[in-house]
Amino acid sequence: MIAEISNSQRTGYTASKIFHMQRNEIELFNNTYQFMLVHNYVNYFLTGGVFAMEEGDASGTGLWDPVKKKWSESLTSIISKDLLSKLPPVSSSIESIGNISKELVKEYGFNSACRIDAGSGDNMYGAIGTGNIDPGILTISLGTSGTAYTIVETPFVDPTGEIACFCDSTGRYLPLLCVSNMAGGYNSFLEKNGLSHSEFEALMTYTHPGNDGNVIVPWYEGERTPDLPNASPIYFGFSYDDLTKEKVARGLIEGHVLNLYEGFSKMPIEPKEIYLTGGLSQSKVWCQMIADIFNCKATPVLGEGAALGAALHAGWIWNNENGSNETLSKIVKPFITFNEQLRCTPKDENIKVYDNLKSLYSSITMRIRGLGGKDPFELKQGLKG
């Protein structure tokens, strides 16, 4: 699969949905003229009939190779010999796809010179909207799921398939990690214990980094990365006396960040700075935890990164197509606002502790997956307070 499309196949990709339709709703499949993502259809409507998908979103269909930049005839033919003819052309992400339709100009008064941007995915635009437009920056989105992505000049193909090889929306590439467990376990803990975010943060003051080697592997609803759909959470090292609200709280947040870090460790980057977005990014505890575990300065970005990125991308494309040589960086920089009060740098006293905890976490997950690894019980001894 990786040799064919430079990615593994995921159930959330478009390929699996079309495959399901072809097997279970054959009449609907046969009557489909063109498959599009939602924003491709919006563009189709705005332009009055342009069928187009751009490279960023095509990367996530599970049918298009972002390295060869073409639809996979082998994969499409496995689903149906007719599928390739039902897929739209893939346009460049740095060009518009056409003008707004005459009908919409007449009905709503749009400027007839209005061009329609090709559009892209939320993570591609999230990179722009958080100021992540040059190599060396890592954006982490802390929502129901967690994502981490960066910009690189050449494609990165992960032989394990855990890091997605995507095109970005600037003509470059966006290696992307997605874990399915992030805010879900945290929010459930708050709800079960009747805690506010500030009360949760207060609990953290009663414990110390490393949690004496008591680790929670937060696979609450299976896990996407690593690909373990039937997984459940693991509470490692907790004695009966350790099962306090305070220690479980620390184990939970450390586990979520460690789960993200373990996937990130396969990415082709040593970040010089991390930009944070998503609901949990405005928490001092989460920011500091990420700074310490990733051993890198971490700063939350204010606003809706993906929405801002879409607007800035459209402005950049408009400028380019109207003779301006203004760089994307120059356009983006004035609009990015950081929450300086929550800017966190790694604490020297925590870095060594978390280096040991990262090794312990990795040994636990490797043993569970049958991949060998070091003895987690032995590693835990070095983390006892």
Regions found by a protein language model. Name each.
Residues 1-5, 12-52, 62-81, 96-98, ...:
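Active-site core segments that coordinate phosphate-bearing ligands/cofactors
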Residues 55-57:
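Conserved redox-cofactor binding core of oxidoreductases
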Residues 80-92:
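A conserved helix-loop-beta module that forms one wall/lid of the active-site cleft
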